[in-house]
């Protein structure tokens, strides 16, 4: 996977995290723990990004941008278990804060919010 394609996946993941909770939940079938899937999404892409940039020495995010993205992922990782229910994803103030932070990150990356590409996340 090219580093540019990886950047695209990360941006789409941030768009997904900026989306309304009902939109987020609609992406997943009923038989999965949707909260867990949402929580792992950005982190999985970040792991691949960090591995790829170390191997290729080719960053496409500035250090400041990368720290903002990692901070967003950390905020999600620090949520208590009760925040991963479908109800919490759509109603919790903590998820509202995560969505707002994701929107701010998109702006800082000169990206506009749009419906995320389902096939890229």
Segments predicted by a language model, with ranges:
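Short, flexible helix-adjacent loops and helix caps
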Residues: 22-26, 81-84, 114
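Structured alpha-helical bundle/scaffold domains in large eukaryotic membrane-trafficking regulators
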Residues: 110-121
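Amphipathic protein-protein interaction modules
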Residues: 48-104
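Short terminal alpha-helical segments
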Residues: 1-49
């Amino acid at each position: 996977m090219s580093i540019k394609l990886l950047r695209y996946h990360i941006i789409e993941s941030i768009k997904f995290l900026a989306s309304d909770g009902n939109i987020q939940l609609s992406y997943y079938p009923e038989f999965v723990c949707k909260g867990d899937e949402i929580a792992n999404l950005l982190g999985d892409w970040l792991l691949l990004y960090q591995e790829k940039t170390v191997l290729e020495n080719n960053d496409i995010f500035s250090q400041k941008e990368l720290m903002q993205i990692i901070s967003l992922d950390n905020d999600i990782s620090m949520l208590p278990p009760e925040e991963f229910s479908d109800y919490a994803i759509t109603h919790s103030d903590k998820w509202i804060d995560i969505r707002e932070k994701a929107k701010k990150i998109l702006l800082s990356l000169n990206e506009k919010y749009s419906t995320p590409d389902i096939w890229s996340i």
